[in-house]
Amino acid sequence: MAKESPQEKEFLQLVKQHERIIYKLVNVYAVDEEEKRDLIQEILYQAWKGYAGFEGRSAFSTWLYRLSLNTIFTFRRKESRNGTKTGAVAAEPWEDEQANSSLEAKMLLKAIRELPELDRALISLHLDGYAHAEIAEVVGLTETNVRVRVHRIKKHLITTLNG
């Protein structure tokens, strides 16, 4: 077994530290367990491939979030072109104790999964506690646009959940 290089050790440590980002996004966008596994594997592959180019101009978590979203969107476009499953809304809730503990959380997750891809990314980042400036950096929008869109998404979710 080959010894890990310092770069590999650093990468693995950073991924371990921020793995929740990957799992949360995959659970929001993926339909079934097989698709989740495929996406996680592809995200990790793309992250390792791109890690040498990570210059630290943003936080690793921001870089990983952006890379994960790009990988998910590319994966879904490929599935769409190939005529395989895509765009379906997953029925199962997040594999998170807090989400599983209440009906409201399950309903919220279902409503989030029904949002367009970019809106899902915006609200996921917002719910993860990212500031509007950080979200703007991740998704490539202006901070003002992010603020407005997040506000509209929240209003839409409230309307949806209140029937």
Protein language model annotation of sequence segments:
Residues 139-163:
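DNA-recognition helix of helix-turn-helix
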Residues 43, 67, 122-123, 135-136, ...:
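Hydrophobic positions on the alpha-helical face of helix-turn-helix-like DNA-binding modules
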Residues 92-137, 158:
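Amphipathic alpha-helical segment used for protein-protein interaction
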Residues 24, 38-45, 58-70:
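Structural recognition of an alpha-helix C-terminal capping motif at a helix-to-coil junction
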Residues 4, 42-59, 78-79:
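Sigma70-family region 2
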Residues 15-33, 50, 112:
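Amphipathic, Lys/Arg- and hydrophobic-enriched alpha-helical face
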Residues 53-55, 66-86, 101, 152:
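Arg/Lys-rich amphipathic alpha helix in sigma70-family domain 2
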Residues 1-24, 37:
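A short, charge-rich alpha-helical start-of-domain segment used by transcription regulators
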